[in-house]
């Protein structure tokens, strides 16, 4: 085949391929056009696939008013409820540096509230967190029993002193911040600022560091303003939906109230507090919903504060021996009897025990009938406080008494650059319990301390 014949042959093949391609394209266009005509003339023809529409309705959790009218449940001992192990976990995890943890429950859940230092454990910003009051401290909360971290915690308020409680509808939080000579308490209801309380003595306005108490839609808290080592001023506040509706200043000469642990009982409120001035036994105040109040000291010779003397003869006024300084604590009143929570050490914040004194609310002897170990004297404890589980949460027909214990680690007792704590909690039951030691258990110092 000569060159001209090759050119003619190749050209013919290309022309045939082109014609075939053109015919295929024309066929494709005709097919699409016919399909469109069929759909146009049969508009009611069912779709080839089934389409389903899902409708979602958001259901709000039911709200109730926590009545608080029930009496405390009868109990024979204390069952462990939670332990967060936050210092142990914080050696390798992102855990907040905290102090002053406390627990409060709604009708649906219990949460741990705590005052952060704006820092994480084992981090440079944990240096110097032994300080109580700073602009970096905030009130946050997380589910009870969980280590407080940036991933499970909810911001509540800017605060270096705080309280919180649930009325059955929303959370009330009280956060105090600002300078010592002019701090302000910011009240929030459902996360929204609803009221404020200005320091009235311009001397470190402070509140409970544990839950406030709610009865029939009203919540109650106690605040202190004035010296920590002599006569100060104390007020009870009645709060409804986040707004102060009434307050009364206690007429309490020679009394000293700080960091009260309050709970509802049969429609009234009982608060057991810290005397940082001159009492090694604990002062109390009880009041009704109109803020008509009574005051006193726990009479028992089983003393509840630390430091304190050895148990002996008590007083229904302040017991002055070793009465200066103190630690936040609690007790539960049962008629003339009292459950007393206290450190095991008479001089330091170490160990913890629960003691039942069947006549200790009104009598001054030091006899008691039950003691349950919580923390060994060789392990650190710290603040402690009460909280209540309402019948709307438990399904019981009574108020379940519970308490938490702060387990302080770090400065000033240990060689670290930081101060923080974990917590444990117990609830009262009328069944079998056991005494043991549930310490913090962290191995110090951390890497940042070396």
Curated annotation (Swiss-Prot):
Pfam families reported in the protein's UniProt record: Neur (PF00064)
Keywords: Calcium, Disulfide bond, Glycoprotein, Glycosidase, Host cell membrane, Host membrane, Hydrolase, Membrane, Metal-binding, Signal-anchor, Transmembrane, Transmembrane helix, Virion
Main location: virion
Activity control summary: Inhibited by the neuraminidase inhibitors zanamivir (Relenza) and oseltamivir (Tamiflu). These drugs interfere with the release of progeny virus from infected cells and are effective against all influenza strains. Resistance to neuraminidase inhibitors is quite rare.
GO molecular function: exo-alpha-sialidase activity; metal ion binding
Gene3D superfamilies: 2.120.10.10
Quaternary structure and partners: Homotetramer.
The protein's name: Neuraminidase
């Amino acid at each position: 085949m000569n060159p001209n014949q090759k050119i003619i042959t190749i050209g013919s093949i290309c022309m045939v391929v082109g014609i075939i391609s053109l015919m295929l394209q024309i066929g494709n266009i005709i097919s699409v056009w016919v399909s469109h005509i069929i759909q146009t003339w049969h508009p009611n023809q069912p779709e080839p696939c089934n389409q389903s529409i899902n409708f979602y309705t958001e259901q709000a959790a039911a709200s109730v008013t926590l009545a608080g009218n029930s009496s405390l449940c009868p109990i024979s001992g204390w069952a462990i409820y939670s332990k967060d192990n936050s210092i142990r976990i914080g050696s390798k995890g992102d855990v907040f540096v905290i102090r002053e943890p406390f627990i409060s429950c709604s009708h649906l859940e219990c949460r741990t509230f705590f005052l952060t230092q704006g820092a994480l454990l084992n981090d440079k910003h944990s240096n110097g967190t032994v300080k109580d009051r700073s602009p970096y401290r905030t009130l946050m909360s997380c589910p009870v029993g969980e280590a407080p971290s940036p991933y499970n915690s909810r911001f509540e308020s800017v605060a270096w002193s705080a309280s919180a409680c649930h009325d059955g509808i929303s959370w009330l939080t009280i956060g105090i911040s600002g300078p010592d000579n002019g701090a302000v308490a910011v009240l929030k209801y459902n996360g929204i600022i609803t009221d404020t309380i200005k320091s009235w003595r311009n001397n470190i306005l402070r509140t409970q560091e544990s839950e406030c108490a709610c009865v029939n839609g009203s919540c109650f808290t106690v605040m202190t303003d004035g010296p920590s080592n002599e006569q100060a001023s104390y007020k009870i506040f009645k709060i409804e939906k986040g707004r102060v509706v009434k307050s009364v200043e206690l007429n309490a000469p020679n009394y000293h109230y700080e960091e009260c642990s309050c709970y509802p009982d049969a429609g009234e409120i009982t608060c057991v507090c810290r005397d940082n001035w001159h009492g090694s036994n604990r002062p109390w105040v009880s009041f009704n919903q109109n803020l008509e109040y009574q005051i006193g000291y726990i009479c028992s010779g089983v003393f509840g504060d630390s430091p304190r003397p050895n148990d002996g003869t008590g007083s229904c006024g302040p017991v002055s021996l070793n009465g200066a300084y103190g630690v936040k604590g609690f007790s539960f009143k049962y008629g003339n009897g009292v459950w007393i929570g206290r450190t095991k050490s008479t001089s330091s914040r170490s160990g913890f025990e629960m003691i039942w004194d069947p006549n200790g609310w009104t009598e001054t002897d030091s006899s008691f009938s039950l003691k349950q170990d919580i923390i060994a004297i060789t392990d650190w404890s710290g603040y402690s406080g009460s909280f209540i589980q309402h019948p709307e949460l438990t399904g019981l027909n009574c108020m379940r008494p519970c308490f938490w214990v702060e387990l302080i680690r770090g400065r000033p007792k240990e060689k670290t650059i930081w101060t923080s704590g974990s917590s444990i909690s117990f609830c009262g039951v009328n069944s079998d319990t056991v005494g043991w030691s549930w310490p913090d258990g962290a191995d110090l110092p951390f890497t940042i301390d070396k």
